[in-house]
Amino acid sequence: MTHPDEKPWILGLTGGIGSGKSAAAKCFSDLGIDTVDADHAARWVVEPGRPALEQIAAHFGKGVLQTSGELDRGALRKLIFETPEQRRWLEALLHPLINQEIVSHLAKAKSPYAILVSPLLVESGQYRMVQRLLVIDAPAHLQIERTMLRDSSSQEQVEAILKVQIQREDRLRHANDVLVNDRDHAWLSSEVERLHHFYLTLRGGQS
């Protein structure tokens, strides 16, 4: 448990779509480690009533809103995939707000170390918040198969997402640790437990 006046030791956890980063994060959580998911923070900042949602609707038009007033993520995703400039505008708006949410939640961590789970850890600059970076990696064919199964997406849709995401080599270049998730869940769980004990050792060495 961290001391009230002590900054939490943060592990960054990232990986491409279909790599299994969420499954790995769940394994860490099952071991009692507090996790903050950047995707959840990204949803919080665009909830109805939040200023960011109003700015998005003003910029892209009411077509990105559902009848309930909530963000229509599918409509927005289509717009930003088709126009890189629009994606950059959206990132410039949301990334600082998301980072504020992340910092706030990480500060509340009570476990020996905390984990920031983010698919955009490297490209958003969020890696600067962490003391160590773990990349969950997987062969491209497995990423495609898993995502098609999970999201009922076509192969073309998944490949398009992979092209937009940061290049695998760039992600790996920032990594302190790499876990190649190409086996079953039991193996993944045992590898996470091994890393967990290693991180406890590192955390114990922090002043």
UniProtKB/Swiss-Prot annotation:
NCBIfam families found in the cross-reference section: dephospho-CoA kinase (TIGR00152)
MF GO annotations: ATP binding; dephospho-CoA kinase activity
UniProt binding sites for ATP: 18-23
GO biological process, one term: coenzyme A biosynthetic process
Major location category of this protein: cytoplasm
Record function comment: Catalyzes the phosphorylation of the 3'-hydroxyl group of dephosphocoenzyme A to form coenzyme A.
HAMAP family on file: Dephospho_CoA_kinase
Protein name per the record: Dephospho-CoA kinase
Signal peptide start-end: none
Record's keyword terms, sorted: ATP-binding, Coenzyme A biosynthesis, Cytoplasm, Kinase, Nucleotide-binding, Transferase
Top class in the EC scheme: transferase
